[in-house]
Amino acid sequence: MSGGLDVLALNEEDVTKMLAATTHLGAENVNFQMETYVYKRRADGTHVINLRRTWEKLVLAARAVVAIENPADVFVISSRPFGQRAVLKFAAHTGATPIAGRFTPGAFTNQIQAAFREPRLLIVLDPAQDHQPITEASYVNIPVIALCNTDSPLRFVDIAIPCNTKSSHSIGLMWWLLAREVLRLRGVLPRDQRWDVVVELFFYRDPEESEKDEQQAKEQAVVPAKPEVVAPVHEDWNETLEPVASWAEDTAPPAAPAAAPAFGAPPAQEEWSAQVQDEWSTTAAAPAAATAAPSWGGSAQDWSAA
């Protein structure tokens, strides 16, 4: 499938990641169309998937995605919670359109409803769970790429990528590998360069566990600002004790304003006394003038004389 090119061949690092994520472990049951991807069966009944065939189908799926001119015409769907985070991350890095959660029936066939879409390529997580979009895609001739386990039905599936779809780590790793291969085929990411996006970002995380981690991080968080701020403040206070003595010495001169009133008071008092005496002298003349009232009596004498 990879054309026999060494550049597209499976390397040891990717194989190690697949084995660590249990991508090679299938189900106990096997579909007759998936028998070609099974390497052998273990003693406990679990079928082992051939990872070489997995990588070949993954490269083929990446080539199909790159062939679409507009990345938004590629729809990625996952109704299972374990694959919704991986689908959203894949769409964010490749430009595809994600549908995480419940698929609206008739989105590909009913042109009347507002959710009507016309994708050119469809990528689903599990054909058994996402059977509705696969069935509608068959009505409008949309090619379908699916991550399939050994017991997954392959009806209306054009490209099947055999892998373990029961493990959240395996699901996240397969979407991460597919996104990396798409970026490499587009020329965005060189093949001799490591992708700076880690695989853990594609893994499913339990909301309760994430909340607990956030609470623990808040509890363990220490505020170093308080001890750092208090120490320099004490040092500043100790240093400012010396200027305080100079301020005490400077407080003596303010006594001069108190002497100012003493300087202005005597002349003010002398002037007031002088003015008071002058006024009294002037007012004393008024009673003297008032003593001239006997003139009225003189007039009265004139009246008696008359």
UniProtKB/Swiss-Prot annotation:
Record PROSITE patterns: RIBOSOMAL_S2_1 (PS00962), RIBOSOMAL_S2_2 (PS00963)
Official protein name in the record: Small ribosomal subunit protein uS2
Pfam families: 40S_SA_C, Ribosomal_S2
Region described as Disordered: spans on this chain: 209-229, 250-306
Domain of life (superkingdom): Eukaryota
Any GO BP: translation
Subcellular location(s) per record: Cytoplasm
Composition bias, Low complexity: 257-268, 280-300
Organism: Bombyx mori
Molecular function as annotated in GO: structural constituent of ribosome
Keywords noted in UniProt: Cytoplasm, Ribonucleoprotein, Ribosomal protein
Stated family: Belongs to the universal ribosomal protein uS2 family.
